[in-house]
Amino acid sequence: MAMKCVAFVFTQGPHGNAAGREGLDALLATSALSENLGVFFLSDGVLQLLPQQQPEKILARNYIATFGVLPLYDVENFYICEDSLQQRGLSEVTDWILDVEVLSPVNLRRQLANYDVVLTF
């Protein structure tokens, strides 16, 4: 049986709720079972990748750095939505905590269509 391609889509900002942390936990767990993973950041999910966050100031757990170790788990396909960046004034940011490929919404949808399962957080 062929392994399914699984996409993880992060649509919510960090620290306001547990969605980002739960998605990252699910991604790490799935990485042990599959090599066909893609990680997408759109809408407020692009905020997950901003460097130099200080969640401890709002008494939140700092899980963001864990995104940076995903390549060690052979997770290597990372995509971020160009429009989402522009809408949040982040189009000039280049020091993301992951090496992401910036895609237009059309190309992001095309890339996402290559996956059998899409999990949204």
Swiss-Prot record:
GO biological process, one term: tRNA processing
Disulphides: none
InterPro entries given in the database record: DsrEFH-like (IPR027396), Sulphur_relay_DsrE/F-like (IPR003787), Sulphur_relay_TusC (IPR037450), Sulphur_relay_TusC/DsrF (IPR017462)
Keywords: Cytoplasm, tRNA processing
One cellular component (GO) term of this entry: cytoplasm
Source organism, top-level taxon: Bacteria
Localization annotation: Cytoplasm
Main location per the UniProt record: cytoplasm
Protein's job: Part of a sulfur-relay system required for 2-thiolation of 5-methylaminomethyl-2-thiouridine (mnm(5)s(2)U) at tRNA wobble positions.
Family: Belongs to the DsrF/TusC family.
Subunit structure and binding partners: Heterohexamer, formed by a dimer of trimers. The hexameric TusBCD complex contains 2 copies each of TusB, TusC and TusD. The TusBCD complex interacts with TusE.
PANTHER family (UniProt xref): PROTEIN TUSC
Protein name: Protein TusC
Organism: Yersinia enterocolitica serotype O:8 / biotype 1B (strain NCTC 13174 / 8081)
